[in-house]
């Protein structure tokens, strides 16, 4: 089947937001108005089309990025649903990698919230063009102007409204379109499908003229001809303004702000128009970078069917009907069923069996897909999240790898029976393949299975899936903090390993300089050997020895991170030296760091934001201080106070219940991992006693 839409008519975009800003409802309405969904699914009753895992329906939060294809004004929209809960930022990050543009949804009552900041920063990292939709304008206390201010203040982004609401709260009637200078009004019946243009109400005319002048001044700055004409007193045409807004979105010069209420079916169609008018097509973004599979030189792929095939696998899901599904973005070339592909990341072959176009959870079998498409492949055996698939014969490539953060929290799981043990192994293998921020390991001493993740909710949901989807009965331990260790000072260690008991002995002497590295630098090994004091073939043994012990740490068995080891000198014996002897020597040298390297225990510090009514402020701050929290500041949001603090994760377990009790359920909080910090000595002593 040949292409049905030109690649210029594609819009691959996602909807990103804080939890509860109305992201899923907005997506639902988009699917409804674009004709892909016959009934509107409400998150309130757990039936939204995009939220198709049982766990999501129950909790009313979107966990997995489902990809959906829909159509609007002859344009093809591929919508990637991204989760809004902070424990799933990995999912957001993964979907941002494959998007060309995004709609940021804000709650008109709350404005920019902590998770909005997190996903905005991630979108900055991947340079994703954005437009902003201020939702929930029907809510009591919704304030469009204040939301726009919060974008400027909290995100440091240049916000330029291209609409503003007519009426507010329960009297929300529609919006003023500042590009066309028309009022757009919805009827209250017919689920918002019918709407019409009217003249702008007289009492809003002054505001509209002022807001449009601000829009036009910012828009014409991006086009020399338009700027010249405007300075000469000529008002730009609607087409010119749209062209300039599009340029602003593509370059990040400013962000157009729209408004409405998805729940009340107002403002969604103009939002779709804006997606088509302002967000980029695959050809508007820079070519995708990659590494040539054979030469390892940097190379690029343009968004074109004529280029060699390059595909990124960005999500793996277990589907009850089809088995394992791999969601893929085709960056270049054409893919057909039956084709043999190279997984260039792992140097393995794959075959395209079934290829599906997804609509949240209905699927359509297709035979061919082209550059710009987002499809799901069934039955891939070797492919994991972040892998590249390409044509093995036409200049194979490895696209940029996605980087995933290290988990900060862990729990032990013990299956109740032998049958559960077997089911658990299979289930965990699948869950780890689907989600790179979730890892599984075995504690060698206790034999327990350890699950590691990004937060309490993240692990709760994994356990829920184990019990519900895979029917595993297991005992779950209490959550534990993923502590780390670091060196306190630079130190030289000289160690000789000698074992001579008749026959061939073992001999190796190593002199290693250990020093603390920058945060995030990981383990770095260097050899500064000159003149063959240690023969070249033995040096890998030194590195291997250090790598085998660094994760067992020095103080309490936690991985030693961010340090550099330089092999400066050593000695060997013609007969008794071997790679193994140097491996043993470097391991023993590492252990001496406990006494000589002033090791420190590190703990994950979370960035916490609590939103509380004024009357509970004292209790909230007192409680955070008692948790070793460092209060960073507070400001007002509506009639609530927002407290920002850094708090050790170890002191945040069960905080949700404490806060609920303290504020009669009226305060909320969110937290994200921020950095690792040394643990105060009196606390470190207790932790070391517990784990060592």
From Swiss-Prot:
GO cellular component: cytoplasm
Classification via PROSITE patterns: G_TR_1 (PS00301), G_TR_2 (PS51722)
NCBIfam families cross-referenced by the UniProt entry: EF-G, PRK12740.1-5, small_GTP
Entry annotated with the keyword Transit peptide: no
Domain of life (superkingdom): Bacteria
InterPro entries assigned to the protein according to its UniProt record, in alphabetical order: EF-G-like_DII, EFG_II, EFG_III, EFG_III/V, EFG_IV, EFG_V, EFG_V-like, G_TR_CS
The organism of origin for this protein: Caulobacter vibrioides (strain NA1000 / CB15N)
Compartment list: Cytoplasm
Gene Ontology biological process terms from the UniProt entry: ribosome disassembly
Function field: Catalyzes the GTP-dependent ribosomal translocation step during translation elongation. During this step, the ribosome changes from the pre-translocational (PRE) to the post-translocational (POST) state as the newly formed A-site-bound peptidyl-tRNA and P-site-bound deacylated tRNA move to the P and E sites, respectively. Catalyzes the coordinated movement of the two tRNA molecules, the mRNA and conformational changes in the ribosome.
Domain tr-type G: 8-283
CDD domains, alphabetized: EF-G, EFG_III, EFG_mtEFG1_IV, EFG_mtEFG_C, EFG_mtEFG_II
HAMAP family: EF_G_EF_2_B
Binding site for GTP: 17-24, 81-85, 135-138
Name of the protein this chain belongs to: Elongation factor G
């Amino acid at each position: 089947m040949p292409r049905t839409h030109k690649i210029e008519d594609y819009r691959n975009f996602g909807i990103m937001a804080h939890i509860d800003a109305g992201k899923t409802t907005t997506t639902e309405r988009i699917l409804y108005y674009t004709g892909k969904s016959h009934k509107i699914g409400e998150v309130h009753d757990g039936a939204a089309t995009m939220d198709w895992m049982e766990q999501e329906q129950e909790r009313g939060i979107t966990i997995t990025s489902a990809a959906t294809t829909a159509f609007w004004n002859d344009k093809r929209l591929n919508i990637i649903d991204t989760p809004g809960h902070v424990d799933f930022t990995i999912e957001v990050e993964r979907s941002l990698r494959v998007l060309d543009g995004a709609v940021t949804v804000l709650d008109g009552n709350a404005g920019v919230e902590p998770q909005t900041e997190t996903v905005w920063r991630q979108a900055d990292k991947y340079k994703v063009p954005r437009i902003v939709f201020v939702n929930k304008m029907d809510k009591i206390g919704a304030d469009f102007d204040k939301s726009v201010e919060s974008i400027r203040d909290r995100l440091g982004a240049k916000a330029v409204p291209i609409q503003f609401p007519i009426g507010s709260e329960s009297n929300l009637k529609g919006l003023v379109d500042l590009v066309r200078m028309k009022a757009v009004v919805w009827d209250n019946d017919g689920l918002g499908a019918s709407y019409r243009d009217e003249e702008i109400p007289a009492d809003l005319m002054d505001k509209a003229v002022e807001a449009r002048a601000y829009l036009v001044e910012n828009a014409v700055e991006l086009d020399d001809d338009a700027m010249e004409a405007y300075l000469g007193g000529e008002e730009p045409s609607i087409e010119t303004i749209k062209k300039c807004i599009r340029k602003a979105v593509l370059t990040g010069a400013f962000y157009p702000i729209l408004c409405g209420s998805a729940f009340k079916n107002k403002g969604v169609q103009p939002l779709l128009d804006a997606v088509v008018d302002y967000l980029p097509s695959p050809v508007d973004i820079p070519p995708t970078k990659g590494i040539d599979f054979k030469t390892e030189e940097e190379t690029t792929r343009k968004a074109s069917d004529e280029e060699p095939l390059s595909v990124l696998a960005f999500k793996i899901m277990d589907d009850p009907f089809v088995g394992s599904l791999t969601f893929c973005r085709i960056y270049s070339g054409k893919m057909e069923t039956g084709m043999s592909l190279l997984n260039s990341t792992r140097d393995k072959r794959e075959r395209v069996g079934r290829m599906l176009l997804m609509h949240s959870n209905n699927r359509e079998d297709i035979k061919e897909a082209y550059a710009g498409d987002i499809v799901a492949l069934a039955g891939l055996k070797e492919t994991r999240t972040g892998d590249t698939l390409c044509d093995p014969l036409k200049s194979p490539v490895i696209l940029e790898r996605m980087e995933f953060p290290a988990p900060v929290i862990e729990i032990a799981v013990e299956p109740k029976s032998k049958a559960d043990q077997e089911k658990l192994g299979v289930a965990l293998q699948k869950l780890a393949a689907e989600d790179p921020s979730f890892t599984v390991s075995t504690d060698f001493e206790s034999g327990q299975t350890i699950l590691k993740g990004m937060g309490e909710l993240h692990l709760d949901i994994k356990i829920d899936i184990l019990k519900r989807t895979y029917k595993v009965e297991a005992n779950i331990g209490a959550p534990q903090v993923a502590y780390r260790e670091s060196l306190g000072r630079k130190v030289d260690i000289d160690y000789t390993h000698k074992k001579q008991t008749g026959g061939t002995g073992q001999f190796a002497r190593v002199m290693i300089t250990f020093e603390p590295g920058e945060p995030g630098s990981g383990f770095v090994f260097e050899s500064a050997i000159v003149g063959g004091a240690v023969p070249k073939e033995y040096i890998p043994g030194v590195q291997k020895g250090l790598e085998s012990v660094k994760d067992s740490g020095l103080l309490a068995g936690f991985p030693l991170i961010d340090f550099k080891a330089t092999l400066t000198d050593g000695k060997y014996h013609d007969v008794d030296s071997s790679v193994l002897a140097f491996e043993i020597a470097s391991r023993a040298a590492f252990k001496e760091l406990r006494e000589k390297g002033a090791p420190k225990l590190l703990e994950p510090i979370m960035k916490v934001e609590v939103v509380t009514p004024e009357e509970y402020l004292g209790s909230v701050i007192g409680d955070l201080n008692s948790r070793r929290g460092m209060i960073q500041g507070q400001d007002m949001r509506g009639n609530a106070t927002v407290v920002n603090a850094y708090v050790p994760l170890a002191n945040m377990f069960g905080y949700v219940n404490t806060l609920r009790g303290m504020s009669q359920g009226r305060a909320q909080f969110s937290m994200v991992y921020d950095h690792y910090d040394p643990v105060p000595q009196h606390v470190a002593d207790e932790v070391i006693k517990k784990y060592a």
